[in-house]
Amino acid sequence: MTGKNVSARVGVTVTGGTPIFTYYAEPEACGTPASVRFYFQTNTSGKFEYTDYWWSDVAATTLESLKTGDQTLTVDFSNPSAWSDWNGQSGTTELAAFTAAVKDVQFVGLSFGGGCHFENGVGIAPGSGSAYFRLMDFTVTPTP
């Protein structure tokens, strides 16, 4: 994925009530609301390494904000400062590992979480309403 951008057009459709989005282990000190962001994984055939898993930092949005309109998220794989690993370390801090991971991407997609965690899952508070997440476009293109 070296030299590539990934973008996704996402939205939420409310189907009843006023859904309140939650995340696993809520509340936490970090306070980040239930969100969606990009994720990629490199080859994990060896022992577990924090730097095998990466999440976009800025290219993210809250599920609450998607109730009022669709958004397009975009992130550059060539920008290590736009990503953090499983342990929360920036791609600039772990530059060698980030560069190696980008050269050997095995999976790329979207991840849902909140609080201090980008991957802990999200849901809707019981009795608050109902909604569904929409993915209208997911594209990987060369960086301009």
Language-model-derived ranges and their functions:
Residues 1-4, 27-29:
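Extracellular and analogous surface-interaction loops
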Residues 108, 135-140:
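Extracellular beta-strand elements of beta-rich domains used
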Residues 37-42, 129, 134-136:
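Residue-level signal for functionally critical sites in structured catalytic/ligand-binding pockets
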Residues 143-144:
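Short, solvent-exposed mixed-charge patches
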Residues 3-5, 70, 103-107:
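Extracellular Ig-like/FN3 beta-sandwich strand-entry sites
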Residues 9-89, 113:
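Extracellular ligand-binding interfaces
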Residues 78-132:
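Extracellular beta-strand ligand-recognition surfaces/modules
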